[in-house]
Amino acid sequence: MDLALTPEQRAFREEVRAFLAASLSPKLRRGAALTSGVFAEPDIAREWQAILEAKGWLVYHWPDHAGGPGWTPVQRWIFEKECAEAGAPILPGMGLKLVGPVLYTYGTQAQKDHYLPRLRTAEHVWAQGFSEPGSGSDLASLRTRAVRDGDHYVVSGHKIWTTQAHHANRLFALVRTDPHVKPQQGISFLLIDMALPGVTVKPILSASGDHELNEVFLDEVRVPVSDRVGEEGQGWSIAKFLLENERGGSSFAPAILADLARLRTSMGPLTGELADRAVRLQLEAEALEMTELRTLIEIEHGAAPDPRSLTTKLLASEIRQGVEALAVDAFGLAGLQLPVERPFYGDAMPTPIGSPEAQVAAARYLNARAWSIFGGTSEIQLTLIAKAALGL
Amino acid sequence: MNLALSDEQAMVRDMVRRFLADRYDATTMAKGPMSPDDWRALGELGLFALLTPEQAGGLGGGAAEVMIVSEEMGRALAITPLAEAILLCGRAIAGSAAAEEWGDRLMQGDALLAFAPGGALVDGRLRGSAAIVRDGMDAAAFVVETEAGALMLVDGQDSGVRRTPVRLVDGSMAAHVRFDAVQAQPLTVPAGMWAEAQALAGLSIVAELVGAMASLLDLTVDYVRQRHQFGKPIASFQVVQHRCARMYTWLEQSRSLLLKAALAEEEARVRAVTAARAYIGDAALKLAEEAVQLHGGMGVTDELAIGRGLRRVLLLSRLHGGGIAARAALAA
């Protein structure tokens, strides 16, 4: 038993470190540090995506047959850890982490050839059309319907909580193609060009004042049948595959630990209850990092994922929320600034009182509440853990 | 990076697990301290020699072996003096004449050494008292850490040693020990060995806690499956499922910090053990409290391993200042 990196892994870490030191401009670092939502804003994200793609490391988590660099699970972890410590932007995951793996796993050759390269160059920017106003945790009850008409589906419905749909030009969506079978069996997975007639995006402003979320209305949108992924009725299995990637595809702890360390620097020395909370969060995050590593190391040595991997999204949500709450408390009244201008790193922002970290703290606190809701609520996660890990 | 046990480590784990499984089940776990005969039998199997450094005549097993053995002890809720007698005192005597006098007997399970913090040297004699000395009634000798921080060995036969029994919450026996001008032999612990001893004793305790957590969760999951109310197993209620799932997250997070501490490089070990103590004690007590709650009335009785497990976890989680002291050390 040991936790030491091999000489090859250490050399790889140095290579990643050197690349990050050379490639992450002050602008990108500042943009990442002052991001108030889950993902970097488009100006920051596009620039960083292009740098990674040029290096060949953008789709580091894809297998080599799909165009990835062929890294092992531990190499991927090293890369994520180094990116987090260097303060790299968090790229939107809808394309890279969600629909990308769906396409190389379930897509036809024509779909792979068309969509994967455009995803990588950011010619296509993806949004996720899963949730509906009446279908959140009970996703299988979704009602957006797709009626076959020759070589097309005619799609009508209403999607909600669509992150960054206002920046996207492609939507992957779950639609009901058969209303007469068990709900899970009547669902299909479609790729929708958002420029098609009948697609309307309406903003939803978050409590923080950020515009991350949207509603997407689909009104008799004609989608070619060739843009269905998998078989008709296979959408639910594909969605489960995708959600497993969303919850467990990469490590949460490195980013939390790095953010906590950066916050500790700008918060200064803490005493009393704040100091105790900071230590507890640090411990939880260190434990989570090891919980994630244990599973990665086992997979690296050929084992199947352990049910413990189901705990990480739940734990990461709570630790993340704890960190943002600590920041608000530690910054005092300065942590309650909530200017309406966006982004926080932009020129239009008023001069921060205290520090830029304090200025962004309240927005980050508010947005972090979504962690325990998106990608399966914490209550859904607990039910999954009880079933898969404990057999209840 | 590799988390698989070596063949030798797996053999040790299986040996300890089999030995304990023959003696402890849900009705006998944590009923009382391990019998001297069983303790001696473990000594004869070579377990204590494995965990003793070579300078003290042992086989020099490291942190991973301490973790593996202690976790099994915890899983059986066995009440033993492993951490203090073997890991702490066994290292305190390494390099001194005391190792020749006591080393073999300690490793064979024939004699116990107990750790007694307290007392001061006055005119070359030890005077004062140690308030609570775990396993102090049965100890053949004491490793004393004086108020000035010196390590000394005191023979339990010395006429100036006075012991008063103190029963602790887990049913183990401690002693209030007074030293009335007793002879104390200075221990010359090799450099770094005492810090190593404290780290390994701390590691052993958190490993026992993780083992105990795993058992208490297993027992609870079994119980909620068979316990029926309102015409169905209470395991079918979502509130019960979620509470069990929470217990599982505490167990896995605890095991992670335990592994990190056991596998830490030497220079990072003290910090990693402190981090494990800072988290695991509280997590284990929360889990034990939940186990009691989910067992209902039976959980608060002395009949089941659950109630007795709570008592054992309470003791282990509060040793050496518990999580409060460990978190304060990390915050400093």
Label every model-predicted segment.
Chain B
Residues 1-76, 199-332:
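Alpha-helical interface subdomain recognition
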Residues 190-195:
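The feature captures the short pre-catalytic strand/loop hairpin that immediately precedes
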